[in-house]
Amino acid sequence: MAFWLSLIFFCFCTFASSTPPDDPVKCESGNNMCTVTNSYGAFPDRSICEAAKVEYPKTEAELVSIVAAATRAGQKVRVVTRYVHSIPKLVCTDGKDGVLISTKFLNNVVGTNPEAKTLTVESGVTLRQLIGEAAELELALPHAPYWWGLTVGGLMGTGAHGSSLWGKGSAVHDYVSEIRMVSPGLASDGYVKVRVLSETIDPDEFRAAKVSLGVLGVISQVTFQLQPMFKRSLTFVMQNDSDFGDQAVTFGEKHEFADFLWLPSQGKVVYRMDDRVPVNTSGNGLFDFFPFRPQLSVALAIIRSLEESEESSGDANDKCARAEQITSFLFSISYGVTNNGMEFTGYPVIGKQNHMMSSGTCLDSHQDGLITSCPWDPRIKGQFFHQTAFSIPLTRVKGFINDIKALVKIEPKSLCALERSNGILIRYVTSSPAFLGKEEKALDFDLTYYRSKDDPLAPRLYEDFIEEIEQMAIFKYNALPHWGKNRNLAFDGVIRKYKNANTFLKVKERFDPLGLFSTEWTNQILGLKGNVTIVKEGCALEGLCVCSDDAHCAPKKGYLCRPGKVYTKARVCTHVKSVNGYDDHTKFNLMFNRI
């Protein structure tokens, strides 16, 4: 206990800067013969994505020239952002002959209009830059994800969001008034077409481009409709989760920026009471989220080794004890929020929107030889995880929460793996006019949990409980998966859940009739060809399939395909203890002559 708390304190003494993340694109010869990955160093299927070359345009004119050349040559094209935080294979081209277009240097402000409260930026601008540029004009982006390392193009491509039911909701794309898109063209167009999209010019094209998965072309520029600067008043409160099902339905109507951190094995919820207040309200608060700060690589390696030890030994007691220490520590330091940028003196914490909405100081760039880094940097022994994220309709949230509670009642230690990553983050979203945006008011559940870095066939402690939650959400509660997160199975048949999918596909056909910006992966998730699931030995362990056979799990290690415990239609990899040569399931069938 003393060692663990000392280690946490050691990590708490974080640094002002860290080694910046590596470029996700690596090439053997100049900008040719390349591979691309994401910021975590692995896709859900652990495949290596290759491309013939990568291009780094610095202006829209250069971007237009690159798209024209690729179209003329009939090459597949995908867009790569500065850090590539999407977990699925959204950046991969098919085969080895495609072209990657990086927006790394498309990172400039194009124009401002303080009177109209608009800001136009290139698509490679990061959320951090966007927030800062808006603040210079005394304007604010009202909602955004909590991690500021995403780019404008990445935000738009995957439908990234914050947390709110108020106004237009929490999705960044719903605060966009205009998009410039560069797409393939006909020979008569010079093989390229630049479109200016807005609600007034062509609503269907604009609504398709708001969340496009990169299949319509390259976003060149985006114009944001901002709001006058305001402040926020934030208080975190931890309570037991006895009435959480009821609270979850109504809490978002009471607080504009409400969210939750649910610790189901501990029976606790952290409520975020977060409201807009006038800009002249006293307070200089700053939210520098602790897990997004630079961390000592040696400390991260020790923490990861402890986690690996818990998994290999099957020791849920240690996992639960450490999870409680981590969550208690983070709550005790208010997750990194301070009243004056230096210290936390008490709630409420009041600060300007640009200081309270997003953070990510581990991106601050000074090369230090990886002495410090972002916790998930694949070059070190640090965090490596699955991330399952989905939106449950608000009208059905109480039932979903109660189902999870029922699982915890069966085995209280089963979800400590989620709490070791600070619990289930739950954010409010609302319906969006974007064709691939959210369909209705909902709560977005974000589950982060251990993944073996070296062995895709390694089962996880109590993995059947998390798999059951995943399948329960997707199949029983008709949840919408987050486009930029998730394992393959979450996208099985997903396009059928969007009422405007056919209209989106018509726009796609108009923008890119040859499918140069489409890939095998995008065709699968859009329901055009094939299926995202991959059926093979051990496929269910990493969410590549839903098991239908013991071989899809890890039978040699005692993990067999079994029905869910609460959602019995689920098929999950369960650790089965054998007695007298038969597991419990087989003994049951023998008793009733079922085999």
UniProtKB/Swiss-Prot annotation:
EC code(s) of this entry: 1.1.3.8
Record's keyword annotation contains Nucleotide-binding: no
Pathway: Cofactor biosynthesis; L-ascorbate biosynthesis
PROSITE patterns associated with the record: FAD_PCMH (PS51387)
Keywords: Ascorbate biosynthesis, FAD, Flavoprotein, Oxidoreductase, Signal
Keyword Flavoprotein (UniProt): yes
Family, similarity comment: Belongs to the oxygen-dependent FAD-linked oxidoreductase family.
Function of the protein: May be involved in the biosynthesis of ascorbic acid.
Protein name in the entry: Probable L-gulonolactone oxidase 1
Protein source organism: Arabidopsis thaliana (Mouse-ear cress)
Lineage: Eukaryota, Viridiplantae, Streptophyta, Embryophyta, Tracheophyta
